[in-house]
């Protein structure tokens, strides 16, 4: 919890529908404007805070106590947070964990992220659940506590629809990734050797999480990360064995030029997409995108493998989904491989001829369960078999064939 050595800093969260929640501020002093959402994960707040997929959003944690284990550099998913604000019931200033290097309030203050605590987060989550996404204004600035003005500002703020948020989070130039998954301090936990031979992989950075890159490296890929606007010609010049489409924030329809590049590359290279990358692949294959009422954000989403009937508990973080009917009508031989059991939205797709597949959820988790990490092994298998001259399809691999 936050110490009370000084008077609490007044803060409020005002929504576009006129609802106002009053609490106290911590972290950065300022104003955050964005789309309000909630995450149901009990742990992993640091990974959530540093996930670039949250650009343009105000994130509410449904679990009551946040910050207990502090913050450490190993668990960061990006160099800095990209979210607009953070909402919790009760933050902790004095963490207790041997890996902690900084408290949550200090971390948020360092990056200037405004946060509010002491509000009824259950009531807020119910409002989002019942009424859907809407904009909000979170102010921890003592000089800006005009709630009526905050409501008007929330109403006039642009929605996420149509905004190219990927342009705000992608890397500025290509780089090599060569860090493995974390295996304890000084690597004292056992590690399997990287598979051989290695394969050259170009990974599009739409807001990529570090744990995805770690797991791709661990599967024997020599990973070159490239900016989102990299052309198909530039990718071909790198002579990759495969292409990866990463996660990222916002509306996939708004990401400039990428759909056309992916459509070009999809006919030439094995391709795997996660989250936003899955949606962009769906667009490239002729599908359409629809916005969900309040999205899927959390580490406890049920994803069903249609071929086997098995259900994996998955980490998800998205407000948009590929429309199943549009995908079926697009004319491409595409298989819907996975669905979300809560609302039957598309969670996976694969091509029945070409080596292409993707998943909406996060097999790398971070945070979340590891039920779906096998997709990284399947991706490597698809690349290896295609490299050996076998005409294996994405559907064969995604469905375990």
Residue ranges and their predicted role:
Residues 25-26, 63, 294, 316, ...:
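Short clusters of small/polar residues that mark proteolytic maturation junctions
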Residues 114, 200, 270-272, 288, ...:
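Proline-centered loop/turn at the N-terminus of a beta-strand
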Residues 237, 241-242, 246-324, 368-386, ...:
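Cysteine-nucleophile active-site neighborhood
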Residues 1-233, 237-238, 252, 330, ...:
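RNA-binding accessory domains that recognize and position tRNA/RNA substrates
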